[in-house]
From Swiss-Prot:
The gene is yiaO. It comes from Escherichia coli (strain K12). The lineage of its organism: Bacteria, Pseudomonadati, Pseudomonadota, Gammaproteobacteria, Enterobacterales. Its main location: periplasm. Belongs to the bacterial solute-binding protein 7 family. Gene3D superfamilies: Bacterial extracellular solute-binding protein, family 7. This is 2,3-diketo-L-gulonate-binding periplasmic protein YiaO. Part of the tripartite ATP-independent periplasmic (TRAP) transport system YiaMNO involved in the uptake of 2,3-diketo-L-gulonate. This protein specifically binds 2,3-diketo-L-gulonate. Is not able to bind either L-ascorbate or dehydroascorbate.
């Protein structure tokens, strides 16, 4: 009888040990391209804190900044294949999987930041998220890259004509590449991790990232001029492997989504708060900041050429553009 009791006690203890180990914290590998000084990394740490708080430490993130897990395309492939759990990158990187994502690279699409946020946080944003689910990706939230501006080492850019012949690094979006070709520039897509060296060696003259990225990546060290063109608003997508997400409990799923969204709102605020400090810092570093430019002249130079291209390439393109324009 004693032996049976001891055996039973050991069995129960073993079950408890197994249960405890099975509930040990799950770690999700989360990669992105920007540095540890960028708002993206700062907000990613908050995301992790919120997630652990809401899951009592049972679900957490392991952060991989600085392109540690590869460039955006490599990380997206990794997430789809299940070798990486999560990644964060610009919307342009998903257009090859879902052409509707090209909507977000149509220049001068949004009137202002509030219009961009309301669009992304509403039905249009939900429809774009849904377009990736069949590709093995679940979009948890939209974070902020920001308004794209032009820096270069050649001369001040004040008008569209000033872009003529400029070798400018662009992202891989067909919309963005087409826009700079219309301006007369020579757009050169290039992985983010190669941009600093490209600017330093004059392989390229210019680039067009939001200024918070220009600052954290130190592009200003190898550029002379910053023109606040605000030619496009660039969101970030925080994505997770769809099968991984579906395998989590409903409680963990909710914690993941709510934490990503709250951290995203925090990151948007960080970007807004940093703008003037970054501009001042660039001026102190010797960069000439051009604010007296006519953004309407840039928009007028494009006309509807890029919008028409989007409508031609995407069956529901006209409806999507109309939906964005109608957001108040």
């Amino acid at each position: 009888m004693k032996l049976r009791s001891v055996t039973y006690a050991l069995f129960i203890a073993g079950l408890a040990a197994f249960s405890t180990s099975s509930l040990a914290a799950q770690s999700l590998r989360f990669g992105y391209e920007t540095s540890q000084t960028d708002s993206q990394h700062i907000a990613a740490k908050k995301f992790n804190d919120l997630l652990q708080e809401r899951t009592k430490g049972e679900l957490k993130l392991k952060l991989f900044p600085d392109s540690t897990l590869g460039n955006a395309q490599a990380m997206i492939s990794g997430v789809r294949g299940g070798t990486i759990d999560m990644e964060m990158s610009g919307s342009n990187n998903f257009a090859g999987l879902s052409p509707v994502m090209n909507l977000l690279d149509v220049p001068f699409l949004f009137r202002d930041t509030a219009h961009a946020h309301k669009t992304l946080d509403g039905k249009v944003g939900d429809d774009l998220k849904a377009s990736l689910e069949g590709k093995g990706l679940k979009v948890l939230a939209y974070w902020e890259n920001g308004w794209r501006d032009v820096t270069n080492s050649r001369a001040p850019v004040k008008t569209p004509a000033d872009l003529k012949g400029l070798k400018i690094r662009t992202n891989n979006s067909p919309m963005n590449i087409a826009a700079f070709k219309v301006f007369g520039a020579n757009p050169i897509p290039m992985p983010f991790a190669e941009v600093y060296t490209g600017l330093e060696t004059r392989t390229i003259d210019a680039q067009e990232h939001p200024i918070n990225v220009v600052w954290s990546a130190k592009f200003f060290e190898v550029q002379k001029f910053l023109s606040l063109t605000h030619h496009a608003y660039s969101p970030l997508l925080v994505v997770i492997n769809k099968a991984k997400f579906d395998g989590l409990s409903p409680e963990f799923q909710q914690a993941l989504v709510s934490s990503a969204q709250e951290a995203g709102n925090y990151q948007r605020k960080l970007v807004a708060e940093d703008q003037q400090k970054i501009i001042d810092g660039m001026k102190e570093a010797g960069v000439e900041v051009i604010t007296d430019l006519d953004r309407k002249a840039f928009s007028d130079a494009l006309g509807n050429q890029v919008r028409d291209m989007f409508v031609k390439d995407v069956p529901q393109g006209a409806d999507l553009l109309k939906a964005v324009d109608e957001v108040q």
